[in-house]
Amino acid sequence: MGAVVALVAVMIVGTFAVATPASAAGPRLKLSVLSSRADVVSGGDALIRVTVKGVEPRQVRVDVDGEDITGKLREGDRPNRLEALVTGLPEGDSTITAEAADDSGRPDRLVVTNHPAVGPIFSGPHQKPFICDTAHFKLAVGGTLGEPIDADCSVKTRVDYVYRNVHGEFRALPPDVTRPKDLAYTTTSTGENVPYIVRVETGTRDRGIYETSILHDPQTPEPDPWTRPDGWNERLVYKFGGGCPRGWYIQGRATAGVVDHGLLSRGYAVASSTLNVFGNSCNDLLAAESMSMVKERFVESYGRPAFTLGHGASGGAYQSHQIGDNYPGLVDGILVGASFPEVGFATIHTITDAWLLHRYFTETAPGRFTEEQQKAISGFGVWKTLPNLASAGRRIDPRVFCPAQLPVELRYHPQDNPDGARCDVYSHTVNVYGWDESGNAPRRPLDNVGIPYGLRALTRGDISVDDFLDLNDRIGGFDADANLIPERTEADLEATAIAYRTGRLLNGGGGLSRIPIVDYRDYQDDASGGDIHLRVHGFATRERLREANGRTDNHVMLTEERGHGGFNTDPATVAGRALSELDAWVTATAADSDPADSRLDRIARNRPQWLSDSCWTKGDAPQRIWEKQRPDTSGSRCAELYPVWPTPRLVAGGPLANDIVKCQVVDLGDTKVGARLTARQRDRAERVFPHGVCDWSRPGVEQQPLEGTWLKF
């Protein structure tokens, strides 16, 4: 049955506050939720705010479903703001009411919807089976979390302290919290010089294990939303981890790492969850839900950060892009590395095409094409990229990438256990796409009908017409279990439509149209063994932003040779400096409230000069080249240093955006290639492409705009 999607209200970017209808001028009260959207509260708690105008704060009274909570009100960061941490909310809807005791102001009411701490909220039914990993989760102070306390893999929340010593090591703080003699101090980005002691909270939300960290000396008052640690710069960095294969059916044994010197030393708070590591859970929807719940927990503990920065490479970039676009307000800016737009399309298209091509070159027609010709057909700059990516393509096979924690007897087998757990990308996204008509396999938005593989190689004379026709005649496709078959793969049209309208295929016109994006890349295209992290994918994201918004000046690309630090948080490296500059960009944009200009205008004019498209020369003393980055293999200094090699679908004539799931077709005879064919070749071409070849000039089949943001499944 197909997934059912409901659109909920779009969130105000940069906050969680849900606005009430505008009231008449005069004294009034306004309620909002600071810790999350009002409709996605979890765990029974919510940090709320009452903004007062023309009313004495001492006259304000607040109740939840008739229960007076006025005694919990605290003064906020401004005289006209009152705040309270509401606890004990039942599951479902509750009505919060704020009114003036002397009837001096218009009252306000806000409905909040609370969900279980174990979820789900908007990601759909929990996946089963689900293997707990708490007993293997290593704590910052050593040891593990131990066994879970329920079937949802929950643990009791705990707080530990570590400190950094003068030798650059993190150690557990003594139980009596006295300051060790070798304690280091750090100076934060705001100039505070504080003991380098870190408060680490570990717990569970949405069945994942989360960690948060923040500079805090336990000899000072316990932090809460109104008592913030001296060393916190009021920024939260949310870290997203990479991976994808084997990322299903497990809780996960590590987050993306919150005891991060490069961040903590500058005063940033850090958060992550095991379900925000794609190697544990390769599902952007569940990642968004987990982040929402963990950030909510953080805000209830420390107050709302001024800004939240998303930070992730590879599988972490998938999350940063899609959370930023589909669930706006969770991040205010993102720094990505080794990026792709998303896993389900840009990546899957490339690696499954590589699988088909490699099988053809090595098994179907061995010896027919030289390695140079294979490179011309695939587009890759290094031949070994082809087998490397072909292996990665097995993530669509339900039998290959099962996590070690998943018992063999629970795994899918077509004969022995047809109802077992299917270990593939599409089965892990069944809440979105639903099951096919048989009920045994997920719907798949995967298609290669009409794709003229090797078209550019043909037009450039690298291969002959007969070579081109044989390749396309025998390349084949995949059945529901990713067995290689002679026929091409046909997409499920319902799944294809869902992919576009829900943002599973990154649109770029949702929340990403309102935040700064920094794309860092330590170049991997020339890796001798091949590498999946191709530079072209960053340009696919940029092209989607251009198509959605008409401009891309909120997107910056930085490229350097690998081996100079890579994607890390050390401020002495390019990526580490980029985080500081992203912070400055977000901060300056927020301070620019000129109503005469669009959000993108304000982002563009507040971009730090350092954050300009650039690459660095190779070698021990790299020099910066300030140059617009382009998707070319030559024609500029950066393109010469770091060529942008195409994917098989680009070689087949596809768009740079890589956003067509299933192409519309045109008769081969109506193309330039068709005009070159002999009568014999034309007869074969009609058999090879019975429905025609892709007409990439038209939108894809079922291609449609984003339905909205904050969708529920």
Where are these regions (language model features)?
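Sec-dependent N-terminal signal peptides
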Residues: 1-10
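C-terminal His-loop and adjacent cap/lid subdomain of alpha/beta-hydrolase
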Residues: 25-313, 317-713
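C-terminal region of N-terminal signal peptides and the immediate post-cleavage residues
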Residues: 12-28
